Amino acid sequence: MIQDFASDREAAGQAAVSTRLHLEEGAKIRLIQIQRLGNGFTFMNDIGALCEEKASLEVIQLILGGKNTYLGCKTTLQGRESSLNADTAYIVGGDGRLDMNYVAVHEGKKTQSNMQAGGVLRDHAFKLYRGTIDFKWGAKGAVGNEKEDVLLLSNDVVNQTIPLILCAEEDVEGNHGATIGKLDDELLFYLESRGMNREQIYEMMAMAKVDAVCRKIPDAATRAKVQEFLGRAGEEEEAEE
């Protein structure tokens, strides 16, 4: 399932989307969401999912445009051995704001969740990431992981990461981690010695974050739209060749 939210680059306005999913026993859904809205848009996006026994939900999100983006994703892993895998990539610049709230509720036995987010903050951008793994009583053998990797390309950005693990069951495993930093001076020196300027280096590193998630999209036409929005039209075809 592909949801592509797009507009002209200079467009402004508000948009709100709510997606509800009920995965019955053994069902598998891959939900792909791409946000390519204009730089004056405020976008609110909410996902709610319920997974029954051995159901599997994969969520892939690319946040590339808009001024203010608010994301929410709550998945209840109700059935035994149900699973969630969420991958999010973002680029936030200017005075843009990105607010993310991801929740994995483990109710069934041997359920699994993996929530990963990675992106780049530029200029005066603000980003808040909240990731919650909630182990309910009875979720024996459940495993939950959350991780964020943020690259800061300005001293004026505001980055906030709030991981939370709630546990009402003993026989579970929960892990969280975050990597937040700037480009290493030695790496900058090396790349500059190879003929790249600072702007090119920052752009390359930003695109690497998006490309890592974009490659997980199986539809070539959708990947091409992402590259076009990023000003890299034709690179998808070249990479495939």
Question: Locations of the language-model features?
Answer:
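Extended amphipathic alpha-helical segments enriched in small hydrophobics
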Residues: F189-D211
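Conserved beta-strand/loop scaffold segments within soluble protein domains that form the structured core
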Residues: M1-M196, I217-E241
